[in-house]
């Protein structure tokens, strides 16, 4: 299954707020309607929608998400928590959480167009797995700096998670540590996602 490229509002109307996909928010009326529908949903539907929320927020294909679930299952610790940590440490998500892009799809575009450096080297792979002490910067060209500065200027500093530090005037972000799950940028029940896949095998 390919990455979703359809209307964003259609997805948030059904699944709720997905900040990685779009800055738009569902209306109060839609949220109330979803809550009423939620009480009538089957357990399968609830698990499916949690999985879809994760997939659309991080902009993954079905195959990519399944791969992350399998890697998480082989790691030490809670599969759900490891899954969220892996997704949060993707370069496209880090760029988004630093405020260098408005959404994850936009961050992915910046990376694909080679505007982003990790530790002084161009990285053009959005799924690149970042690690503590990595330094993320805009390429030393005016176009790259202008693109990223536009978003840094408007990004709310109070929403910056505690595992990241940003230096807007240097077009630079630093990863301090692996993310604590309470700072994950999406309201999600990751255990339902793991359960969804465990029942598919």
UniProtKB/Swiss-Prot annotation:
One of its GO terms (biological process) is ribosomal small subunit biogenesis. InterPro entries: Ribosomal_uS4, Ribosomal_uS4_bac-type, Ribosomal_uS4_CS, Ribosomal_uS4_N, S4_RNA-bd, S4_RNA-bd_sf. GO terms for molecular function: rRNA binding; structural constituent of ribosome. Residues 89-151 form the S4 RNA-binding domain. It is found in: Plastid, Chloroplast. One of its GO terms (cellular component) is chloroplast. Keywords: Chloroplast, Plastid, Ribonucleoprotein, Ribosomal protein, RNA-binding, rRNA-binding. Pfam families: Ribosomal_S4, S4. SMART domains: Ribosomal_S4, S4. The keyword Plastid applies. The keyword Chloroplast applies. PANTHER family: 30S 40S RIBOSOMAL PROTEIN, SMALL RIBOSOMAL SUBUNIT PROTEIN US4M. One of the primary rRNA binding proteins, it binds directly to 16S rRNA where it nucleates assembly of the body of the 30S subunit. Belongs to the universal ribosomal protein uS4 family. Part of the 30S ribosomal subunit. Contacts protein S5. The interaction surface between S4 and S5 is involved in control of translational fidelity. This is Small ribosomal subunit protein uS4c. It comes from Phaseolus vulgaris. The gene is rps4.
């Amino acid at each position: 299954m390919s990455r979703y490229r359809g209307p964003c509002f259609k997805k948030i109307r059904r699944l709720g707020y997905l900040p990685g996909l779009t800055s738009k928010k569902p209306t109060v009326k839609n949220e109330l309607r979803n809550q009423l529908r939620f009480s009538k949903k089957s357990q399968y539907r609830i698990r499916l929608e949690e999985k879809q929320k994760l997939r659309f927020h991080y902009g993954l294909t079905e195959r990519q998400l399944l791969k992350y679930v399998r890697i998480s299952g082989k790691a030490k610790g809670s599969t759900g928590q490891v899954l969220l940590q892996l997704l949060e440490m993707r370069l496209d998500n880090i760029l988004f959480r630093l405020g260098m892009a408005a959404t994850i799809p936009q961050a992915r575009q910046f990376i694909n167009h080679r505007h982003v450096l990790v530790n002084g080297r161009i990285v053009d792979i959005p799924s690149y797995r970042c690690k503590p002490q990595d330094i993320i910067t805009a390429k030393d060209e005016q176009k790259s700096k202008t693109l990223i500065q536009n978003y840094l200027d408007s990004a709310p500093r109070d929403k910056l998670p505690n595992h990241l530090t940003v230096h807007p005037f240097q077009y630079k972000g630093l990863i301090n540590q692996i993310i604590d799950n309470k700072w994950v940028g999406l309201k999600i029940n990751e255990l339902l996602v793991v359960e969804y896949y465990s029942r598919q095998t």
